[in-house]
């Protein structure tokens, strides 16, 4: 059995103790699920979906809490505190996520949020994040066609528009003239491929193109008119008031 640090794993309960449950971690040995995370009614033999990380003493432990992001993800996270070693991000777990100074583009400030990539440090085997997200974006040719639906994470405002991360893998750009509503760093929205350039760069639009866009707009307009007609019909006239 192979476990994945920094990700959700389904593991079997093999032992119950006063301070929690031990899970079968295969070659990694038994992994503690502290008592505060043990679901009510859980018993030996049950399988649980747990997130694996290192505690404050660098021991492999499990939790049934779901973090805001997992290893391999890009996310928009807030700085909880800083010290002489780096910044620590709130990612929904008791132990905050470390960003060493070498992984910061600009010195991170407490209370501010940043787009980061989560990974396991090869040297220390610690979970950490990096604000130097470019190095983690794929340089492969994107497998998209014009009109394909994608999920984007808004990354950075530029003179041309907004840089976005497409499907947690590729870099894309929403041009200013394609914006029909405000975007903000950290937004996750549904979008569409406008163009795949020969160099692999992606142009993104927030609305469907061609006939589908016309059909969608027509449906929205119809619903809007029907809603307004209903309000007009049901609203009291001045004489009734």
PLM-predicted stretches and their roles:
Residues 205-223:
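Short alpha-helical segments that sit at the start of domains
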Residues 11-13, 45-56, 77-79, 112-123, ...:
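Flexible glycine-rich surface loops and low-complexity tracts that mediate binding to linear polymers
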Residues 19-22, 85-88, 160-163:
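Short aromatic-glycine-enriched beta-strand elements
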Residues 233-238:
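Conserved small/polar residues in nucleotide/adenosyl-binding loops
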Residues 175-210:
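Long, low-complexity, charged/polar intrinsically disordered regions in eukaryotic proteins
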Residues 155, 217-232:
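Short amphipathic alpha-helical interface segments
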């Amino acid at each position: 059995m192979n476990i994945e640090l920094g990700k959700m794993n389904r593991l079997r309960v093999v032992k119950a103790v006063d301070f929690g449950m031990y899970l079968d971690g295969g070659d990694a040995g038994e992994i503690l699920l502290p008592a505060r995370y043990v679901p009510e009614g859980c018993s030996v033999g049950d399988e649980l979906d747990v997130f694996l990380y290192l505690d404050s003493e660098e021991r492999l432990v499990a939790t049934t809490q779901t973090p805001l992001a997992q290893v391999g993800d890009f996310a928009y996270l807030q700085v909880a505190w800083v010290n002489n070693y780096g910044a620590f991000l709130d990612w929904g777990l008791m132990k905050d996520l470390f960003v060493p100074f070498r992984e910061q583009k600009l010195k991170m400030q407490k209370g501010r949020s940043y787009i980061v990539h989560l990974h396991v440090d090869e040297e220390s085997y610690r979970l950490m994040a990096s604000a130097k997200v470019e190095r983690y974006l794929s340089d492969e040719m994107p497998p998209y066609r014009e009109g394909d639906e994608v999920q984007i994470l808004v990354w950075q405002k530029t003179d041309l528009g907004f840089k976005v991360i497409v499907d947690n893998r590729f870099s894309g750009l929403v041009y200013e003239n394609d914006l029909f509503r405000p975007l903000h760093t950290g937004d996750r929205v549904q979008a569409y491929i406008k163009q795949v350039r020969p160099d692999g760069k992606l142009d993104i639009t927030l609305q469907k193109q061609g006939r589908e866009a016309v059909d969608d707009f027509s449906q929205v307009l119809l619903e809007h008119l029907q809603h307004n007609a209903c309000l007009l019909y049901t609203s009291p006239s001045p004489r009734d008031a």
